[in-house]
A protein has these predicted regions:
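Conserved acetyl-CoA-binding loop-helix of GNAT-fold acetyltransferases
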Residues: 89, 95-108, 131-135
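Conserved acetyl-CoA-binding loop of GNAT-fold acetyltransferases
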Residues: 19, 134-143
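Conserved beta-hairpin
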Residues: 47-63
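Conserved GNAT acetyl-CoA-binding A-motif
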Residues: 103, 110-121
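Conserved beta-strand-loop-alpha-helix junction that forms the acyl-donor binding cleft
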Residues: 120-130, 146-150, 157
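Conserved acyl-donor/pantetheine-binding loop and adjacent beta-alpha core of acyl/acetyltransferases
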Residues: 62-86, 94
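A short beta-loop-alpha structural element at the N-terminal edge
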Residues: 2-14
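Conserved GNAT-fold acetyl-CoA-binding loop/helix
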Residues: 15, 19-41
Length: 158
């Protein structure tokens, strides 16, 4: 398996991946999000990553170009922080532990960038993601209603 930055030529592949997970258990996305705008913004910022297996993109994750939850009071670290979002694994590849490789790849990338902490908002209904983030060492430090859903707010100090 290869974790790497996405290439511009893979925009349609990533969009198809995002569309494929809509409606699957634990996914709170809809047809309007995430879409082409988020993919193009992430590609332009160099913050879209993919997980490749046997030459096929089977997962995607993004470092958010601009943090969306910085103003929330729950965070212990507020400077030099990055968020990740849009974690997706192709439906036929789910329940194989592949989200771990996506999140681990982002953690390694952000450590290289000397990031102080990572923030993530995880949907309250997404039990598998909550378990993964706890297992990987994220602290659950708050809750918030964002983007029409209820989220747990998680932080990892690097």
């Amino acid at each position: 398996m290869i974790f790497r930055k996405a290439e511009a030529s893979e925009a349609e592949t990533v969009l198809a991946l995002y569309r494929a997970v809509i409606g699957t258990p634990f996914c709170v996305w809809d047809a309007s999000y995430p879409g082409e705008t988020e993919i193009q913004d992430d590609l332009a910022a160099g913050t879209l990553y993919v997980l490749e297996r046997n030459g096929e993109v089977i997962g995607a994750i993004s470092i958010v170009p601009e943090n969306e939850t910085d103003d929330l009071d729950c965070w212990k670290v507020k400077e030099n922080v990055r968020e990740f979002a849009r974690v997706a694994v192709r439906p036929d590849c789910q329940q194989q532990g592949l989200s771990f490789y996506l999140v681990d790849g982002i953690i390694r990338e952000l450590k290289k960038q000397h990031t102080a902490a990572i923030h993530i908002a995880v949907a309250k209904s997404n039990i598998p993601a909550q378990k993964l983030y706890r297992k990987m060492g994220f602290d659950f430090c708050g809750e918030a209603d964002l983007f029409g859903n209820h989220y747990f707010l998680c932080e990892m100090i690097l």
